Each structure stands twice: as C-alpha cells, then as structure tokens.
Curated annotation (Swiss-Prot):
Belongs to the HHV-5 UL30 protein family. The gene is UL30. It comes from Human cytomegalovirus (strain AD169). It comes from the Viruses. This is Uncharacterized protein UL30.
C-alpha cells in the first residue's frame, strides 16, 4: 500500500504507533504490550514504510539533523539503524531487537537469546 493510498484507519494506526514510541522514550508505557504491537506494526509495513518508521525513530532519538538523501543513502541507512540501536541499548535492551530488525536488511532470528540475557517476548 502506498502512502497516497493509505486510508484514514491506517493513518490513525501509524500515528498511534509514533505516539507509542514517544511514550516509550518518556517511560510512560507498558513496554511489553507496546513492543509487541510495534514489532507487529513494523513487520507489516512495506519496506519503504519501514524505512520511514525507523527514520521517525531516529528523529525522536537523535539530536543531530538527518542527512539529505543525496548524501549516500545506503551509508546513512546503515548508520541510522546503528544509532537508534545504540540509543535503545542504553535505555531498554529489548527494544532494538524487536522494533528495529535492521529494517529488513538482515534476517533476524527472534528465537535466539540476545547477549544481554533478555528473552524474546
């Protein structure tokens, strides 16, 4: 589904998950419930929408401005994933494994246990 073809319920759902991310960053959320919902939401998006979702995550977590698309998109794409993952490892170690599985660039085995000792939900 393209962004232009997105219906009103889809738009509300997208905004709901951006708000969930904001609540998560402020510590106002039930992270088990929100992580499951956000993981399902992320995985159900098209690749282009996943990139936009991860970019929104970066905007909320990275004080530096986003580079323009012309400045090496692949390099930026990899770097933004690492920055977001690095930020969340400091706060809640489970988040990067569930919500940002490198945006489909790498296959993620959700059955394995992360090195941090956490378990998949």
């Amino acid at each position: 589904m393209t962004t232009s073809a997105m219906t009103a319920p889809d738009t509300r759902r997208q905004l709901q998950h951006v708000e969930t991310l904001r609540r998560f960053l402020r510590g106002d959320s039930c992270f088990v419930h929100d992580l499951r919902g956000m993981m399902d939401y992320h995985d159900g998006l098209s690749r282009r929408q996943q990139r936009a979702f991860c970019r929104a995550s970066r905007v909320l977590t990275d004080p530096e401005p986003i580079q323009s698309e012309a400045e090496g998109e692949n390099k930026q794409f990899t770097e933004h994933t690492h920055k977001v993952v690095s930020f969340f490892i400091k706060s809640v170690f489970v988040f990067p494994y569930l919500v940002l599985p490198n945006c489909c660039q790498v296959s993620v085995d959700r059955s394995r246990v992360p090195e941090t000792g956490g378990r998949w939900l």
